[in-house]
Regions:
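Conserved non-catalytic scaffold segment of RNase H-like nuclease domains
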Residues: 1-122
Length: 122
């Protein structure tokens, strides 16, 4: 009998943002990601591999958001922009199942950031 074992690779993801839209429309409108943190898990065990970046959102962080995560405008002023880190992030998560506690929030913001990288149509 040939038993094939396939390792299940998961990436646990968390983000921090400049805030969130409290009004009408999508939660990400008017806001950007300022931190991405990920850890790799294979077969439910941490591997020690991780991905972490602070990101310059090119806009100010809401005071309420600073109170939540403690990341200040001054701290992220010299950090890379999302476009500069996006390739490394994609390479890290490639082929894995991505898991997030508040997935709707994190995925909405990630989708928004990647949509901003797309060239505008004619």
């Amino acid at each position: 009998m040939n038993i094939v074992s396939s390792a299940k690779r998961q990436i646990i993801l968390d983000t921090e943002t400049t805030g969130m839209n409290q009004g009408v429309g999508a939660i990400y409108l008017g806001h950007r990601i300022i931190e991405i943190g990920c850890v790799e898990v294979i077969n439910r065990r941490l591997t020690g591999r991780h991905y972490h970046e602070y990101i310059n959102p090119q806009q100010l962080i809401d005071t309420e958001a600073i109170e939540v995560h403690g990341i200040t405008n001054e701290f992220i002023a010299d950090k890379p922009k999302f476009a500069e880190i996006s390739k490394g992030f994609i390479e890290f998560i490639d082929g894995a199942e991505v898991v997030a506690h508040n997935a709707n929030f994190d995925v909405s913001f990630m989708d928004h950031e990647f949509s901003l990288l797309q060239p505008s149509g004619p």
